[in-house]
């Protein structure tokens, strides 16, 4: 095998660069361990979502805002792969591109960062809470209808700065981003799924590459976490059937459980002695309005996560969830 430099596209935010560098570090270790002659370099790309910061996500085009320019660079051969936050990836990828690998998922929860150190239920009546998504707004208002939800855009560091400078009582951010940046000490409280169900794929990364790049796909397969890939596939199919983007409050979280309802050992991975058939996927899904939400839960065999996500979405729609 000849030596090759793999060009990795990424947004230029501090979080995007940090998680891309972490992935490259892991891939370098895997390449050394398997004797693969690959090097990696980073190419920064500005996306539409990075350029437009004064408008809410729901008003500027929905899903794909943070990936379209990167995907085009991949199709044009300017880059070979890209590291995305999975929650930013559209449920349907452009022809010629695939999700080549899904590393082990980090914390999927949302995190509350409060100026006063108060938890969500302790915030004063009419507290100003900053968030960037309709998904969070819908669920927070279902939990605390008195809250004043206001949009806050920008990178993690700029949102944290706005918390101090713009008079918010609190802001909501994805826990995984704060943890990847080493900023867990800023978190006041983590929000449970019954209060704020996470975005599809939240906490997971997607490594996108060209479908015809067999050499790179072989490398990425070494980095893929099968259990994360299964659960994220179910969530993404749920989203695709609902045809949702940033304009609709949609959330979903899937995890693996043993047939008796117990979660797998080892941080979400199946123990080596477990038979795959003993595991089931459990998915909780939500589609809501600006001030309400509806839930449906179910479970199925782990072998068919895509069909499962589709079935759960169909059942939720039949029970009254409507995406308009």
From Swiss-Prot:
MF GO annotations: hydroxymethylbilane synthase activity
Pfam families attached to this UniProt entry: Porphobil_deam, Porphobil_deamC
Coiled coil, from the record: none
Reaction equations catalysed: 4 porphobilinogen + H2O = hydroxymethylbilane + 4 NH4(+)
GO biological process, alphabetically ordered: protoporphyrinogen IX biosynthetic process
Family matches, as CDD domains: PBP2_EcHMBS_like
Domain of life: Bacteria
Pathway named in the protein's UniProt entry: Porphyrin-containing compound metabolism; protoporphyrin-IX biosynthesis; coproporphyrinogen-III from 5-aminolevulinate: step 2/4
Top EC group: transferase
Modified residues (S-(dipyrrolylmethanemethyl)cysteine): 246
Region span, Insert: 261-279
Entry keyword Transferase: yes
Co-factor binding comment: Binds 1 dipyrromethane group covalently.
Alphabetical keyword list: Porphyrin biosynthesis, Transferase
Keyword Mitochondrion belongs to the record: no
Entry's Gene Ontology cellular component terms: cytoplasm
Cofactor: dipyrromethane
E.C. no: 2.5.1.61
Function description: Tetrapolymerization of the monopyrrole PBG into the hydroxymethylbilane pre-uroporphyrinogen in several discrete steps.
Subunit structure: Monomer.
Family in the record: Belongs to the HMBS family.
Note: The porphobilinogen subunits are added to the dipyrromethane group.
Protein name: Porphobilinogen deaminase
The organism of origin for this protein: Paenibacillus macerans (Bacillus macerans)
Gene (name only): hemC
